[in-house]
């Protein structure tokens, strides 16, 4: 490798004389315990940090100069979100709007965490009816907001969302693209995601399937042992009289205390 060539995780970019948008590889393989999902989705890694498989997007605005005047904004999309946007172009949507916001990190002394906003739209015409040469508008805004924990939904639905009206923008940048430019960005990124999955998922899937098969085999053996003759039962001295109903000294209170069975789920922090 030539000494003047610097490795990069950049997948694709579009650059004009004033702005730039680029997509970056931030993909991570799922742990063996969750091999079938392929992509990491917030599980804890070996350093006890949470890892998610993402595609990074950066928009730079150097219309006012480079250096300190260069505005750089960032946002992360899930791989399937990139493919979702690609499908919108392939289907041929003439008008389209989609947005997403994220909040993460430890709150500061004032209770604010890092927050990001992403907006993408397509409109064919200006308000005066003129056809737009670059109908796609992509905007990224970075700032801070107050996070609120979501206690509803299933395990993977739980997390944080941004409190309404708490967002404080620090910087933002946008870019306008035509259909071909955006299609090229998304298509090349989608191709990278698919090839990454084929290269990285192979060993994980094999090891995960083997681990899962071993787990099922262990469970079956344990069940067979419990059902075998002579295996000690939980209540060997059980008789039907044990559960004979008798008057209770505590009126209005059941004498039968029900205890929820205790299950341990192999759910990592998300």
Predicted features along the sequence, with ranges:
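Short, low-complexity cationic-aromatic patches
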Residues: 46-51, 75-79, 129-131, 170-182
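N-terminal "first-domain core" detector
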Residues: 2-73
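A cross-kingdom feature marking solvent-exposed beta-strand/loop segments within repeated
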Residues: 59-78, 156-174
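Short, solvent-exposed interaction modules
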Residues: 107-169
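Mixed-charge, glycine-accented linear interaction segment located at domain edges/termini
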Residues: 149-226
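Pleckstrin homology
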Residues: 92-100, 195
């Amino acid at each position: 490798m030539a000494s003047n060539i610097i490795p990069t995780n950049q997948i694709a970019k579009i650059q004009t004389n004033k702005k730039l948008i680029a997509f970056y590889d931030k993909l991570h393989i799922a742990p063996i315990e969750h091999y079938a999902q392929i992509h990491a989705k917030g599980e804890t890694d070996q350093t006890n940090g949470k890892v998610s498989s993402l595609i990074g997007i950066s928009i730079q605005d150097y219309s006012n100069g480079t250096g300190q005047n260069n505005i750089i904004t960032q946002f992360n999309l899930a791989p399937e979100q990139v493919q979702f946007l690609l499908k919108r172009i392939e289907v041929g949507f003439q008008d389209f709007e989609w947005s997403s916001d994220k909040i993460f990190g430890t709150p500061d002394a004032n209770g604010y965490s890092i927050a990001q906003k992403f907006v993408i739209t397509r409109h064919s015409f200006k308000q005066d009816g003129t056809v737009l040469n670059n109908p796609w508008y992509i905007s990224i805004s970075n700032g801070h907001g107050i996070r609120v924990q979501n206690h509803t939904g299933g395990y993977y639905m739980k997390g944080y969302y941004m409190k309404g009206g708490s967002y404080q923008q620090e910087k933002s940048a946008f870019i306008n693209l035509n259909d071909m430019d955006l299609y090229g960005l998304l298509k090349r990124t989608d191709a990278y995601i698919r090839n990454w999955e084929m290269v990285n998922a192979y060993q994980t899937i094999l090891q995960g399937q083997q681990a899962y098969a071993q787990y099922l085999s262990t469970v079956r053996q344990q069940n067979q042992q419990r059902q075998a003759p002579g295996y000690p039962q939980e209540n060997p001295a059980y008789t039907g009289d044990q559960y004979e109903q008798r008057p209770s000294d505590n009126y209005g209170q059941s004498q039968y205390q029900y205890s929820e069975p205790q299950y341990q789920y192999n759910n990592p922090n998300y």
